[in-house]
């Protein structure tokens, strides 16, 4: 039987980087990533302020039957921010991510994303870069009020991450109550997260150079997903306890993409990979096999 990492297993920082060469008017840039397993290629995209380790232990489960590539988006985790003057707008970022897929030797992989990563996954599919999509609480199906609420929460999380001293962070992460105080906005089961993971993701939020430019671009009312993806299998999963992007946004997503499969994730928060990794991995594999 293949060993699978538990939510309590510390995940080491990535040491792999790919240089994405310039393409036409698009600049070159570097991207950090983790690559495991063999089989159908599956790319994992995290949410704003997070890093590739958000996908543990789902990554390890998927790697038992797929080639899994989890990336740190530009300006998040270990990836440097985009070159000066390069916009974080979707029209700019999606072609750059397409270039990154090519640099990783991938042609139309299956793409899985959470939150911001879910929106990026859907955009990649709509532009022909993805073979299938599993989007977990994807951004882009909000009303103006819902978007403003989410951004206020994110700004609060960022301020908290930047303001907490490391000594206090480590002390809080050692207790279930402390981990809940630090992460219950995004996890329904924060006690499952290891102290090491909580410290690492708080530091990731604190140091994310891509956070401010991404949030600035996302304040635009134009940041919505408003078109069908008729030729690509799409699964949309939404946590029943998502406190950041409310469940009714999943209903809008289904109306926008009528052929998508909308699945409720019982007992899961905004980042369900921690709350029920087996369920998330099963959704991904079902979508991969639907092609």
Positions of predicted regions on the chain:
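Alpha/beta-hydrolase fold catalytic core
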Residues: 1-42, 63-66, 92-94, 98, ...
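Catalytic active-site module of serine/aspartate enzymes centered on a nucleophile-bearing elbow/loop
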Residues: 258-291
């Amino acid at each position: 039987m293949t060993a699978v990492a538990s939510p309590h297993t510390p995940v080491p920082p990535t040491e792999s980087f790919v240089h994405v060469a310039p393409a036409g008017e698009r600049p070159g840039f570097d991207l950090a990533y983790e690559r495991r397993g063999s089989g159908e290629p599956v790319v994992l995209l995290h949410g704003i302020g997070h890093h590739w380790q958000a996908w543990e232990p789902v990554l390890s489960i998927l790697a038992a039957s797929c080639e899994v590539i989890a990336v740190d988006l530009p300006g998040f985790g270990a990836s440097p921010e985009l070159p000066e003057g390069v916009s974080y707008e979707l029209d700019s970022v999606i072609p750059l991510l397409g270039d990154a897929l090519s640099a990783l030797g991938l042609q139309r992989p299956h793409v899985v994303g959470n939150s911001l990563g879910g929106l990026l996954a859907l955009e990649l599919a709509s532009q022909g870069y993805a073979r299938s999509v599993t989007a977990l609480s994807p951004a882009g199906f909000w009303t103006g009020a819902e978007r403003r609420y989410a951004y206020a929460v994110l700004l609060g999380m960022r301020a908290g991450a930047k303001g907490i001293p490391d000594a206090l962070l480590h002390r809080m992460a050692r207790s279930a109550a402390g981990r809940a105080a630090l992460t219950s906005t995004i996890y329904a089961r924060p006690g499952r997260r290891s102290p090491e993971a909580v410290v690492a993701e708080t530091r990731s939020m604190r140091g994310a150079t891509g956070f401010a430019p991404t949030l600035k671009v996302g304040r635009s009312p134009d940041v919505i997903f408003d078109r069908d993806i008729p030729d690509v299998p799409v699964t949309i999963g939404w946590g029943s306890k998502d406190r950041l992007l409310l469940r009714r946004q999943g209903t809008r997503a289904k109306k926008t993409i009528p052929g998508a499969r909308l699945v409720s994730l019982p007992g899961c928060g905004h980042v369900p990979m921690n709350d029920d990794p087996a369920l998330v991995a099963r959704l991904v594999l079902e979508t991969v096999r639907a092609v």
